[in-house]
Amino acid sequence: MTSEAASKDPISVLSGFGAGTATSASKNGGRTTPSALTPRPRSGFVETEQVRDLTRRGLGFLNAGYPLHFRGPAGTGKTTLALHVAAQLGRPVIIITGDNELGTADLVGSQRGYHYRKVVDQFIHNVTKLEETANQHWTDHRLTTACREGFTLVYDEFTRSRPETHNVLLGVFEERMLFLPAQAREECYIKVHPEFRAIFTSNPQEYAGVHASQDALADRLATIDVDYPDRAMELAVASARTGMAEASAARIIDLVRAFRASGDYQQTPTMRASLMIARVAALEGLDVSVDDPRFVQLCSDALESRIFSGQRAEAVAREQRRAALYALIETYCPSVAKPRARRAGGGARAGVEGALP
């Protein structure tokens, strides 16, 4: 499959989340509402056939009124894809990031602060009448604002929040009603805006810090599994993000993909590892070849830590795995020197060994 050119309406990335300009918080009928984001184009986003297919499938569920859920391992571009799909809806976007400390009040809203009122009445000069009142101020949080205004909610890594936090979502998706706590005073529920849509992302349950999703919520979500990008997409993204020549970027992409296929690691290398190597190599002007010891060291720094993931390993096992990694570097980033010059310099093996710490 050949790589595609950048899409006409890709989404920008803000602090790793992909969004555009933000509208400031406002007060609506005495309520404070959080800001929303408006997606805007970014040249670094690349749309391939794989992305178009996922986007089409996701929009099909959203247009029918179902909440969408992108599920897959880290590094597969779920968040960027979710924001790209949200941009196609043409509505402001509100983002929530899952967290173990997140509670229902953080989604819906709560009473914040106090409003004081003091009246001193001296209509009769020798009589003073004093009246004081103090009322709390209700603040809408992200879910309430999205439901009330018809925004698109992107709930990133939602399974990092505790399952009981999401009970409020059940009525939103089934009855299209958001039930507010008694402290809201003004209203006990709101009808969900017809244009409200929700997009969720999550990692597999075996990841650290991930909770199992409650069955009642999972049953309401339209789940699409997202796998690692195909080679065409990785190559297009690497070239667009780093400005590196396609031939050089292809070597790095193939190296990382081969390392991932080997299974000889404890932390899966993703497209982020490819971008890391390609970006640094482009900035430093390195040759994407085993001939350049600095490039070999760069690959070692970016990939070797994933083999052991901070765990202690025996010296023999460590050397064996490092040798396997260097063999992959030799295979996918071979020497570009002429044979005679390569023999004089010790060949590719000399370049590898010269990079060993």
Curated annotation (Swiss-Prot):
<comment type="subunit">
    <text>Forms homodimers, probably interacts with other GV proteins including GvpA.</text>
</comment>
<feature type="binding site">
    <location>
        <begin position="72"/>
        <end position="79"/>
    </location>
    <ligand>
        <name>ATP</name>
    </ligand>
</feature>
<keyword id="KW-0547">Nucleotide-binding</keyword>
<feature type="compositionally biased region" description="Polar residues">
    <location>
        <begin position="22"/>
        <end position="36"/>
    </location>
</feature>
<comment type="similarity">
    <text>Belongs to the CbbQ/NirQ/NorQ/GpvN family.</text>
</comment>
<comment type="function">
    <text>An ATPase that functions in gas vesicle formation. A minor component of the gas vesicle, also found in soluble extracts. Gas vesicles (GV) are hollow, gas filled proteinaceous nanostructures. During planktonic growth they allow positioning of the organism at a favorable depth for light or nutrient acquisition.</text>
</comment>
<dbReference type="InterPro" id="IPR027417">
    <property type="entry name" value="P-loop_NTPase"/>
</dbReference>
<dbReference type="Pfam" id="PF07728">
    <property type="entry name" value="AAA_5"/>
</dbReference>
<keyword id="KW-0378">Hydrolase</keyword>
<dbReference type="InterPro" id="IPR013462">
    <property type="entry name" value="Gas-vesicle_GvpN"/>
</dbReference>
<keyword id="KW-0963">Cytoplasm</keyword>
<dbReference type="GO" id="GO:0005524">
    <property type="term" value="F:ATP binding"/>
</dbReference>
<protein>
    <recommendedName>
        <fullName>Gas vesicle ATPase GvpN</fullName>
        <ecNumber>3.6.4.-</ecNumber>
    </recommendedName>
</protein>
<dbReference type="GO" id="GO:0016887">
    <property type="term" value="F:ATP hydrolysis activity"/>
</dbReference>
<keyword id="KW-0067">ATP-binding</keyword>
<feature type="region of interest" description="Disordered">
    <location>
        <begin position="22"/>
        <end position="43"/>
    </location>
</feature>
<dbReference type="GO" id="GO:0005737">
    <property type="term" value="C:cytoplasm"/>
</dbReference>
<dbReference type="GO" id="GO:0031412">
    <property type="term" value="P:gas vesicle organization"/>
</dbReference>
<dbReference type="InterPro" id="IPR003593">
    <property type="entry name" value="AAA+_ATPase"/>
</dbReference>
<keyword id="KW-0304">Gas vesicle</keyword>
<dbReference type="InterPro" id="IPR050764">
    <property type="entry name" value="CbbQ/NirQ/NorQ/GpvN"/>
</dbReference>
<dbReference type="InterPro" id="IPR011704">
    <property type="entry name" value="ATPase_dyneun-rel_AAA"/>
</dbReference>
<dbReference type="GO" id="GO:0031411">
    <property type="term" value="C:gas vesicle"/>
</dbReference>
